[in-house]
Amino acid sequence: MDKRITVVLADANEEFRTALKQALEATGEFDVVGCAADGLAAAQDIAERKPQLLVMDLLLPGLDGFGVLEQAAKDKVQMKTVVVSALYRDQIVSQAMSRGVSFFMPKPCELTSLLDQMRRAVNEGEESEDESQALEREVTAVIHEVGVPAHIKGYQ
């Protein structure tokens, strides 16, 4: 991987934050640019550092996880978000997903599973672009093979 993924962690549980930060840094793929124990600090870290990925719990003192997401949207920070929370109810998961959360994992969770979800969250846009371009090439090849003029498809 040519560039490390920048991450902000936000969790009130210091033990979890520390363990996750160490696991992320050990992979060599991630650069933890912010580590917050409350929602206000998380929102500030996000605004200042503009990470590619946010990993947070919804239960944060000061400003809850939904407030953090709203503040990031106001600050126009575009990032992927993975929520790791004991608050795992259908309505809450649905609300989180509607606010742009990529993945929602229940606590407690295995760090290896969380790392996999984080990688997927960051790479999900890239994969769909590649798939879209591959499909476009395939359709173009079939159209040319059949003999349909290029302008019918909409370009040359």
Where are these regions (language model features)?
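Conserved acidic segment of CheY-like receiver
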Residues: 3-16, 20-24
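Active-site residues of response regulator receiver
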Residues: 11, 57-58, 85
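Short hydrophobic/Thr-rich beta-strand motif most characteristic of the beta2 strand and flanking loop
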Residues: 11, 29-37, 45
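Acidic catalytic/metal-coordinating carboxylates
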Residues: 38, 64-67
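Short amphipathic alpha-helix used as the core "switch/output" element in two-component signaling
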Residues: 44, 66-78
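Active-site beta3 strand of CheY-like receiver
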Residues: 49-55, 60
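Alpha4 helix (beta4-alpha4-beta5 surface) of REC/receiver domains from two-component response regulators
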Residues: 67, 88-103
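C-terminal output helix
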Residues: 91, 109-118
